[in-house]
Regions:
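Bacterial N-terminal signal peptides that target proteins for export
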Residues: 1-13
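Bacterial N-terminal signal peptides
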Residues: 10-24
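Blade/loop signatures of beta-propeller domains
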Residues: 28-65
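Repeat-blade elements of multi-bladed beta-propeller folds
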Residues: 33-41, 72-94, 118-156, 176-209, ...
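Beta-propeller domains
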Residues: 55-61, 90-111
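A structural motif specific to WD40 beta-propellers
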Residues: 64-66, 104-108, 165-169, 228-229, ...
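Short loop/turn segments that connect beta-strands within beta-propeller blades
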Residues: 99-102, 160-163, 221-224, 308-310, ...
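Surface-exposed loop and turn segments in beta-propeller and other repeat-based domains
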Residues: 110-117, 171-175, 227-244, 312-348, ...
């Protein structure tokens, strides 16, 4: 099936078929073991599928497409699955529901049908709650200044998953550049969504009045869309451009029902007050690398634990000393010098991007007692493990080079035995892979021991020169990882050996969902060079004997 491309302006850096879906879902308070209902599959944001038994290291090399669905543009969100339906958006502004068994279209809608803004898309995995789909939107750059009132900014949208009809829509942030890039997560009767923005990219225009956006986490009633609470990550700037701004939330949270906590990582500041810049500059001149210049409620590059019921901050662990940055700063500028809206003192842009936290559960072993950890990857290339009760750093591991478009980007995974991390290395920095590996200057994947952070294995992308910002998923001993080269890989989760390779036709930045012996995987991402566009979602399976 083909749909027309809308000519959507790419973002800066930064009658319908009705088919029965089978038996009903029943009461639902959190993602269950069946299907793949949210981006990370479970509240731990593990991106793992413990129920998978059909595809293994022994037969993953036999995977073949059982169907291929053609979209209107790139697909960068992990498809979600419930019953005999698969849901995913594309970068042409479409939202699709297709049959899981054969890929036939059930229905499709333009996101603009819900928002009233022509140039708008969704780039998140639809959360499946009972008979609802929950998504968020990103307005196209051409509409950031013209959309106003209720149409402006970021919205959370609930849709009837059987028909595509709108149930409710809530504006969660009216800032014109506000957007939703972190997939919604539900628990109980609330849905939780982080708010980011495109203002960091708009700042490259010297005429743009930079910057006023404030990152936040929002909880909404899943049935009505009423905002239950909203917690900001930046002090109130009163809409002034010479104050604190930024600290976007790009990713989905992890939720710990036992502790009543929600964990999330934040982005960098776009701007800070002049007094903070002066304090930082004086500290650097005096040899103090970690001055206490910023306001205590300026939560840049911070892991936050929020009360899941109220949004109150339980603890905050800042993991960078200072980082104010926009796209007007090096190395994204040519020549590499600050221009326009770059702060006078700028940082490395080591935010916590699309790679949300993993809630890790360590069983009792001779090496140590049972314990929980909050793990999270950063664009610095570091994976951190924190105490979920107080945010204390338990361990940290530098897995590979960091950078503006480097380090850990779109999503890590864990199966309880290992943590799986992709390293982008878009700056092509030469480094040595762990455990006597080769020296490379491109992307790689690694597995870490969740108790110690030790790198158990690390392997290069088989295509020299390519980068690997994409998320990963794991199921039944197989790690699924996509490459900017266009390849989809299945690796042995225990060793990193490549067992399966498929040329998808476009850069692969999403991780697949794995349900009932089928791998659902999107292809195409041209938003950041040198990405390769495509318009495909693949469903892979092991052919049955005799077919």
């Amino acid at each position: 099936m083909r749909v027309p491309h809308l000519g959507l302006v790419r973002l800066l850096l930064v009658g319908f078929a009705m088919v029965a879906f089978g038996s009903g879902i029943g009461a639902q308070t959190s993602p269950g073991p069946d299907g793949w209902r949210i981006a990370g599959r479970d509240l731990d944001n593990s991106r793992s599928q413990p129920a998978e038994r059909q595809i293994s290291t022994e037969n993953v090399h036999q995977l073949v497409p059982k169907w291929v669905f053609t979209t209107g543009s790139d697909v960068s969100a992990t498809p979600t699955v419930a019953g005999n339906a698969v849901y995913f958006p594309d970068w042409a502004g479409n939202l699709f529901a297709v049959r899981a068994d054969n890929g036939d279209l059930l229905w499709s809608h333009q996101i603009s049908d819900y928002t009233g803004v022509p140039d708008t898309i969704s780039r998140v995995s639809p959360a499946i709650f009972e008979d609802l789909l929950i998504i968020g939107n990103t307005n196209g750059v051409s509409w950031l200044s013209s959309a106003s009132g209720a149409q402006a900014g970021a919205h959370v949208i609930a849709i009837d998953r059987h028909s595509g009809a709108l149930r409710w829509i809530t504006q969660v942030d009216a800032h014109p550049a506000a957007a939703i890039t972190g997939s919604p997560v539900f628990h109980g009767t609330a849905v939780y969504v982080g708010v980011t923005s495109q203002e960091e990219g708009l700042a490259k225009d010297p005429a743009y009045a930079c910057c006023t956006f404030r990152g936040s986490m929002v909880a909404l009633d899943v049935f009505t869309g009423k905002i239950l609470w909203k917690t900001f990550t930046v002090p109130d700037n009163q809409g002034l451009t010479n104050q604190y701004s930024g600290n976007a939330i790009w990713s989905p949270p992890a939720i710990d029902p036992g502790r009543g906590s929600l964990y999330i990582g934040t982005g960098n500041n776009y701007t800070v007050p002049d007094a903070v810049l002066q304090c930082q500059q004086e500290a650097i001149a005096s040899g103090n690398p970690n001055p206490n210049c910023a306001a205590p409620d300026n939560f840049f590059e911070t892991v936050l634990a929020l009360d899941v019921a109220t949004g109150a901050i339980k603890w905050a662990r800042k993991l960078s000393a200072f980082d104010a940055w926009t796209v007007a700063c090096p190395p994204t500028t040519l020549p590499p010098a600050p221009v326009g809206n770059c702060p006078a003192l700028f940082g490395p842009d080591f935010d916590f991007p699309g790679s949300g936290p993993n809630l890790l559960h360590l069983p009792a072993q001779p090496e140590g007692p049972a314990a929980d950890l909050v793990g999270i990857g950063q664009k610095s290339g570091i994976y951190w493990a924190l105490n979920p009760d107080n945010g204390a750093i338990v361990w940290s591991t530098s897995v590979g080079p960091g950078g503006v478009t480097g380090g850990v980007q779109w999503g890590t995974a864990t199966d309880g035995t290992r943590i799986y991390v992709a390293i982008t290395n878009a700056q092509h920095m030469t480094f040595t892979l762990a455990n006597g590996g080769p020296r490379i200057d491109w992307g790689s994947w690694a597995a870490l021991d969740p108790r110690t952070g030790t790198i158990l294995w690390q392997v290069p992308d088989p295509t020299p020169g390519t980068v690997d910002p994409g998320a990963v998923s794991v199921a039944n001993g197989v790690l699924y990882a996509g490459s900017y080269s266009g390849a989809m890989y299945g690796l042995d989760a225990a060793t990193g050996a490549v067992l399966f390779t498929f040329a998808s036709g476009g850069s692969v930045i999403d991780a697949p969902s794995i349900v009932g012996g089928t791998v659902y995987w999107g292809s195409g991402y041209r938003n950041i060079a040198p990405g390769i566009g495509n318009n495909k979602v693949y469903a892979f399976t092991i052919p049955k004997a005799g077919k």
